[in-house]
């Protein structure tokens, strides 16, 4: 494999570029603070950004973790911002949602630690909701229930419904398991609803998600778009702005930026470009940039 890479100019270029990412991550000081979560009262919706695509969501009387990743390193890539919360400080978690099997979204050590923390604090493990054909990756982690959903299928948990929705991405964890599902989730309870897009490129499905489920708040990815071909599977800030307008949501919370150096745009660029795009679209007052670990109530 190494000899093949050295002989192939395209592979050699990619290896050189990846080496730059690794070196930049290694020498960049880790930033950010860890906080303790604030808990909701009076039926509020609570959103806590942990970093990357990870969120602690309080909705419908349930505590939900989405794509939890507390890793200090993603293989050779150093985490650039600390997780906003510690697993030990979490309240008992009812549900864990994982959007797809990629290593930065389905992080097995974090999932196992959440289960173990739940058993200590509550005596019962949480349930997990995943796309189709992903259960084998989480079956040994101790969850009380494993629920696989296909696109547009829903799972109900007392007053909370969770619907798995399409995205434009792919689900393989390694090269040979492209059968695995992928997508986003819409959580709805009473007057509150949240859409977590997972990983996705811009596509016409945003309009359909908005039309069918009308999410109040959209958690949308804005990073990992350079080189340009990455936009086949990721949204840049302009794409995320268009997606938000298609969804017709009230609030947008950006994610998938600044935590791991997954691509070649400057670390600070996604938020800077999002600010420009939001101003141009007249939605700046509806974009809420969350500090890791600081709970926002809606």
Show the residue positions of the predicted features.
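Cap/insert and terminal regions of metallo-dependent hydrolase folds
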Residues: 3-4, 95, 102, 126-129, ...
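Metallo-beta-lactamase
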Residues: 21-42, 130-192, 272-294, 298
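Pre-active-site segment of Zn-dependent metallo-hydrolases
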Residues: 30-40, 50, 56-101, 105-116, ...
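Active-site-proximal beta-strand elements of phosphoester/diester hydrolases
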Residues: 46-49, 63-67, 161-167, 193-199
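Divalent metal-coordination and catalytic microenvironments
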Residues: 57, 67, 100, 107, ...
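Active-site metal-binding loops of divalent metal-dependent hydrolases
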Residues: 68-71, 100-101, 133-134, 165-169, ...
């Amino acid at each position: 494999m190494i000899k093949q890479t050295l002989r192939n100019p395209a592979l050699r270029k990619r290896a050189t570029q990846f080496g730059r990412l690794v070196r930049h991550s290694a020498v960049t000081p880790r930033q950010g603070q860890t906080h303790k979560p604030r808990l909701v009262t009076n039926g509020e919706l609570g959103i806590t950004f942990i970093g990357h695509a990870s969120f602690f969501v309080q909705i419908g009387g349930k505590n939900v973790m989405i794509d939890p990743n507390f890793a200090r390193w993603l293989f050779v890539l150093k985490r650039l911002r600390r997780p906003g919360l510690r697993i030990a400080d979490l309240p008992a978690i009812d549900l864990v949602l994982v959007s797809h099997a990629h290593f930065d979204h389905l992080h097995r050590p974090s999932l196992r630690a959440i289960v173990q923390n739940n058993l200590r604090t509550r005596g019962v493990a949480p349930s997990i909701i995943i796309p189709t054909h992903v259960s084998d990756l989480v079956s040994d982690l101790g969850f009380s229930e494993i629920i696989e959903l296909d696109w547009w299928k829903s799972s109900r948990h007392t007053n909370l419904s969770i619907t798995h929705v399409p995205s434009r991405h792919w689900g393989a964890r390694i090269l040979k398991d492209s059968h695995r599902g992928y997508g986003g989730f819409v959580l709805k309870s009473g007057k509150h609803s949240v859409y977590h897009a997972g990983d996705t490129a811009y596509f016409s499905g945003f309009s359909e998600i908005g039309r069918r489920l009308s999410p109040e708040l959209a958690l949308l990815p804005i990073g990992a778009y350079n080189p340009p071909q990455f936009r086949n599977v990721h949204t840049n800030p302009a794409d995320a702005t268009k997606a938000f307008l298609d969804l017709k949501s009230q609030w947008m919370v950006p994610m998938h930026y600044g935590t791991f150096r997954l691509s070649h745009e400057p670390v600070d660029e996604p938020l800077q470009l999002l600010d420009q795009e939001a101003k141009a679209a007249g939605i700046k007052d509806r974009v809420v940039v969350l500090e890791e670990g600081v709970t926002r109530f809606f």
